[in-house]
Amino acid sequence: MKKRNIVTAVFGTAVLAGAGLYQKTSQFVDERLYRTHIKRTLFETLKPQTVRIKNMNDAILTGHLLEVDHVDNTLIMVHGFTKDASSLENEAIYFQSICPHTNILMIDCYGNGSSDGVTRGVGFQDVMDINYWNRFI
C-alpha cells in the first residue's frame, strides 16, 4: 500500500510538472513566434499608410508608407537590429524635410515590429525581403 502511494505521488507530480512545462513552452512560443504581447500602435507624429507583403516563405512583412502624390521616387528605410519601423520616425521627419518630393517606406524586417517571424541576425534572407519590397514599389 505504501509503495502504491509513493508511485501515485511520483506519477501525479510528473503529470503536474509536465503540464506546467507545456504551459510555459506554449506561452514562450506564442510570444516569440506570434508575438501576441506586442502593441500594434506605432508612430506618434506621422500617420503612415500600413502596407503588407508576403516574402518567399509566405511570412507577412509590414511596411509603413508616407506617400506623396505624383511622385516616382521612394526611399526605403530599414531599422536597426531588434528595433522596428517606429524607431525611424525622427529620421523619416528629417528626410521629409530635405526630400519633400519622395515617398518614404519604413519597413519592419522579418521578426521585428508588426512583421511575422522570429528575430534573427541580419543576412541573406533580409536582403531577399528588401528585394520583395523593391518589387512592391
Segments and roles (model prediction):
Residues 120-137:
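Alpha/beta-hydrolase active-site loop
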Residues 5-54:
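An N-terminal hydrophobic leader/cap segment in hydrolases
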Residues 92-116:
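Conserved alpha/beta-hydrolase
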Residues 86-89, 114-120:
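Active-site lumenal/periplasmic loops and adjacent helix-entry segments of GT-C-fold
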Residues 62, 79, 112:
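Histidine-centered divalent metal-coordination motifs
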Residues 56-67:
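A short loop-to-beta-strand scaffold at the N-terminal edge of the catalytic core in hydrolase folds
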